[in-house]
Amino acid sequence: MKNSMNVSEIASIIREKVETFDNPIKRENIGEVISVTDGIALVYGLEKAKFGEKVFFASGVEGIVLDLDHDTAGIVVLGNDRDVKEGDVVKCSGDVVQVPVGHELLGRVVNALGHPMDDGGEIRAKNRMDIESKAPGIIDRKSVHEPLQTGIKIIDLLIPIGRGQRELIIGDRQIGKTTIALDTIINQKKINDEVNENQKVYCVYVAIGQKISTVAKVVNKLKESGALEYTTVVVASASDCAPMQFLAPYAGCTIGEFFRDNGMHCLIIYDDLSKHAVAYRQMSLLLRRPPGREAYPGDIFYVHSRLLERAAKMSDKKGQGSLTALPIVETQAGDVSAYVPTNVISITDGQIFLESELFYKGFRPAVNIGLSVSRVGSAAQLKSVKKVAGSIKLSLAQYRELEDFAKFGSDLDASVQLSLNKGKYLVELLKQKQHLPMSIEEQVVLMYIFSNLYNQLSKIQISYINKFEHDLINYFHTVHPGVLKKLSNDMSDDIKGDIFNIVSNFVTQFNCV
């Protein structure tokens, strides 16, 4: 009897254990590497893989699914493909690629996956976001109406940029495209120091396919000017694989979207999208996608449009934040009719066209006003700027035309000669040294002098215009700082009178030596 009771007790214990047993089967979506060549792994299996999904190889290297067939998947390897071997197991993560976002990334240099590349230690970001996200819809947007000041005279006055705009910087190599972008970032330092948190402009600089030495110079320049404290640098250098170069601008855009979606303002530089397109072309050809014009795949337009459409000025309900994009595109011998330049021109809200001929003539920044345009920026210009800049573009265009005409050596009447002389002074006033941005109030003073006080200006020899400009601005700051502050919004008749008296007195005592 005793033994039988023991048996029944044992049976009940076993039954209880079986009924309460809870060890669910863990299902994983796995596959096997068939081949790997030039950073592309062909994987058998992965039946439930999604396009754009992140996967892990046996060695720990990450990859992204960019091609789906009946029983195979084409995966781009985010790292060294030597670590991936035939027969390796591949696991799906169930997630797309994410990057850390937030204020913790300011002042840091990261790669396309958000991993630190500087000596600042681990990034402890509270938030992470998908690098691919849908652009804001029509209802969520607002028209561009706030100025984004670059500190560059010829741009702020003649090709104004607004917060939320997409303005292309295009031109041949080594003629100042990156310099314009850097100067715009540096100029935000002065503005950020004077405004509250919600009006500050945070910056993201994305370096795509550049030499590491070039990126190091950019980072050092930002450090020297104090601009790195509000800037994040995303780097996919020339030594990185094509998939990393392809992901970099999307990662940078996601970092900028954090500020946009939280009611703040952000400026993002893509330097440059030509190399980005080349990286995508390389990936597409290796994935055996059919090539189109210039061997680019058919969806190269969508690759750039879905990136640039994420730049926007948000509506009041969405927090009034903004993301301003300055993409850079490199041309070959000034050919803007190539495939990628024409694509990006059609996507953006205007372009700043740099010309090598102007650059070698000494007119820097070498902006060709005739080919440059800002389609929405004028709505964001200050009233004081509109009043002085209205006739400047026309004067410069007339001067360029008359300059060509005067080369024939024919006799010129007095009015034509006057226009030529005025044009020479205007060209000198619009020249600007790199990394020395100028406030909008200082620009207004100089252009008002040209437009309304040319008789005073013409007393200065043209070779001394740069010295005159430098000394005059210093004179305003030290002796008449109140006048500059009044110019931050509008220009009244009283201010015009003050400027006339100040300039007249200054010209008489200006020392050319």
UniProtKB/Swiss-Prot annotation:
Q: Where is this site: Required for activity?
A: S372
UniProt cross-references to SUPFAM superfamilies, sorted A to Z: C-terminal domain of alpha and beta subunits of F1 ATP synthase, N-terminal domain of alpha and beta subunits of F1 ATP synthase, P-loop containing nucleoside triphosphate hydrolases
Provide the topology term for how it sits in the membrane.
Peripheral membrane protein
Q: Which domain of life is it from?
A: Bacteria
User: What Gene Ontology terms describe what this protein does at the molecular function level?
Assistant: ADP binding; ATP binding; proton-transporting ATP synthase activity, rotational mechanism
Q: Which UniProt keywords apply?
A: ATP synthesis, ATP-binding, Cell inner membrane, Cell membrane, CF(1), Hydrogen ion transport, Ion transport, Membrane, Nucleotide-binding, Translocase, Transport
**Where, subcellularly, is it found?**
Cell inner membrane
Positions binding ATP in this chain are G171, D172, R173, Q174, I175, G176, K177, T178
InterPro entries attached to this UniProt entry: ATP_synth_asu-like_sf, ATP_synth_asu_C, ATP_synth_asu_C_sf, ATP_synth_F1_a_nt-bd_dom, ATP_synth_F1_asu, ATPase_a/bsu_AS, ATPase_F1/V1/A1_a/bsu_N, ATPase_F1/V1/A1_a/bsu_N_sf
Q: What is its EC number?
A: 7.1.2.2
One Gene Ontology term, aspect cellular component: plasma membrane
Family the UniProt entry places it in:
Belongs to the ATPase alpha/beta chains family.
Entries under HAMAP family matching the protein: ATP_synth_alpha_bact
Name listed for the protein in its UniProt record: ATP synthase subunit alpha
- Which species? Wolbachia sp. subsp. Drosophila simulans (strain wRi)
Gene it is expressed from:
atpA
